[in-house]
């Protein structure tokens, strides 16, 4: 991982981080079957929403170039990972692991033994990433209306029930 630094977000990171957030949101949309080009405006709004809510935003950078980010919400001492993303060029180089370690440090600093994660059920990359760190899917079913343009093409069995997905 060489000269990669993990630090808290600074104001001058805004545009670079917003561009990464736009890519992140586009990739998450694809998991729901929604194809959208990354929108810098959407990324800026998402990042601003995190900042306005006083979420912790960590960035990974090397030679002043942003490689990725992680966003955490702390609720009653419990740390929730809201987002973690690395640019495609920075993947499989330990950048996301370094970001996640910083998030785990935040949780431990709050006296919590774990970070809570909200993961889309077919985000295999994230599920595998977390599994390597000892995290397991325990419980959680998202109940909401389908997004506009979202195609629910699968069924997921949970116990005696079957849910649209």
Positions of the model-derived regions?
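Conserved beta-strand in the GNAT
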Residues: 59, 65-73, 80-85
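Conserved GNAT-fold acetyl-CoA-binding loop/helix
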Residues: 11, 25-46
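Terminal substrate-recognition subdomain of acyl/acetyltransferases
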Residues: 132, 136, 141-165
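Conserved GNAT acetyl-CoA-binding A-motif
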Residues: 107-119
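Conserved beta-strand-loop-alpha-helix junction that forms the acyl-donor binding cleft
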Residues: 117-126, 148
């Amino acid at each position: 991982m060489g000269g990669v630094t993990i630090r808290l977000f600074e104001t001058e990171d805004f545009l670079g981080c917003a561009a990464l957030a736009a890519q992140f949101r586009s990739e998450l949309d694809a998991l729901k079957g929604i194809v959208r080009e990354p929108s810098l405006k959407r990324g800026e709004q998402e990042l601003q929403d995190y900042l306005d809510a006083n979420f912790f935003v960590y960035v990974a950078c090397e030679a002043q170039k942003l490689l990725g980010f992680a966003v955490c919400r702390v609720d009653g001492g419990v740390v929730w990972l809201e987002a973690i993303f690395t640019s495609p060029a920075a993947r499989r180089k330990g950048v996301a692991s370094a970001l996640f370690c910083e998030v785990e440090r935040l949780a431990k600093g709050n006296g919590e033994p774990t970070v809570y994660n909200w993961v889309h059920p077919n985000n295999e990359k994230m599920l595998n990433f977390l599994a390597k760190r000892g995290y397991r899917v325990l419980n959680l079913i998202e109940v909401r209306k389908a997004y506009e343009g979202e195609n629910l093409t699968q069924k997921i069995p949970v116990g005696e029930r079957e849910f649209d997905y």
